[in-house]
Regions:
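Active-site diphosphate/adenylate-binding microenvironment
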Residues: 1-41, 47-48
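Short gly/pro/ser/thr-enriched loop/turn and capping motifs at secondary-structure boundaries
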Residues: 13-14, 36-38, 65-66, 90-94, ...
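Conserved thiamine diphosphate
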Residues: 50-142
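Glycine/aspartate-rich loop-and-adjacent alpha/beta segment that forms the canonical ThDP
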Residues: 134-179
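Short acidic, glycine/serine/threonine-rich loops at helix termini
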Residues: 15-21, 42, 69-71, 94-99, ...
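A short acidic, glycine-rich active-site loop
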Residues: 30-36, 104-112, 179
Length: 179
């Protein structure tokens, strides 16, 4: 009840992130309604600076997190009281699901190699935790919430398992295709 919940556009967020955290007032929730990926880090920092005396939890996928990576350093510089909860599946999960449906599993521009999140946290001298099992999730996130200032929690989605394909529309039926 005392935190602000910030979400980037991510497969993990939309499958359960929007449904897990109770939102009591309009200022408890920050979300990019235009479905633009990569705004979460900046929104998390802005919320942390604007919401004095309240913790901010910012949920991002690894794709969106690295799109806003330049802002990550600002969190450290400004001492923003934000926990970055990064759901790491090694690529753009929703794009992979769409490509699986429409391109018979051929992936292009959906997988990437980034620096390790642990290494990024170390460079920023920011506390870091890694969740590799759902049984550890609450304990790891609680430890990050106890930090005064920015902290990073990586959730290894490859070890936890894939999410259902909620976003993918069906293939166009022949009744909709014009000759």
């Amino acid at each position: 009840r005392d935190a602000v919940w910030v979400r980037d556009i991510t497969l993990n967020n939309s499958t359960w992130g929007n449904r897990t955290f109770p939102v009591y007032t309009p200022r408890d929730s920050v979300f990019a309604l235009g479905a633009a990926i990569g705004l979460g880090v900046a929104h998390g920092i802005g919320a942390a600076i604007g919401a004095t005396n309240r913790k901010v939890v910012c949920m991002c996928g690894d794709g969106g997190f690295f799109m806003g990576f330049a802002d990550f350093w600002t969190a450290k510089q400004e001492g923003a009281d934000v926990v970055f909860l990064v759901m790491n599946d090694g690529g753009y999960g929703v794009i992979k699901h769409i490509q699986d449906t429409f391109h018979e599993g051929r992936h292009f521009f959906a997988d990437f190699t980034n620096p390790t999140l642990e290494g990024c946290a170390k460079l920023a001298q920011m506390p870091y935790w890694k969740v590799e099992d759902t049984a550890d999730f609450q304990r790891q996130v609680q430890a990050a919430l106890n930090v005064n200032g920015p902290a990073l929690v990586e959730v290894d989605m490859k070890k936890i398992g894939p999410f259902p394909r909620y976003f993918v529309p069906p293939k166009a039926d022949s009744q909709f295709v014009r000759n």
